[in-house]
Amino acid sequence: MAEYVNYVLGSLYVSDTATSTIPTDVRNFIAPPFPLNFWSGPTFTVSSNTEGGS
C-alpha cells in the first residue's frame, strides 16, 4: 500500500518506497488547449492554388 497520496498541480500522485505513479488524467498535462482545426492548417493541407508537376 502507498505510504502517501498527494496532489501535484491538481493531479493525483501516488507513491510508496519502491515505485510512484501519476494516473493518466487530462489534469496531468500543462499545455494550452489543442486547436480543433489543427490538422486543417496550411502545413498539413495542399493549397488550392498550388501547381503540380515539374
From Swiss-Prot:
Could you tell me which cysteines form disulfide bridges? none
**Where mainly located?**
virion
Keyword Nuclease attributed: no
**GO CC annotation: what is one?**
host cell nucleus
* Protein keywords: Capsid protein, Host nucleus, Viral genome packaging, Viral release from host cell, Virion
How would you summarize the oligomeric state and partners of this protein?
A: Heterodimerizes with packaging protein 45. Interacts with major capsid protein 42 and triplex capsid protein 22, essentially at the pentamer vertices. May interact with large tegument protein 24.
UniProt protein name = Virion-packaging protein UL25 homolog
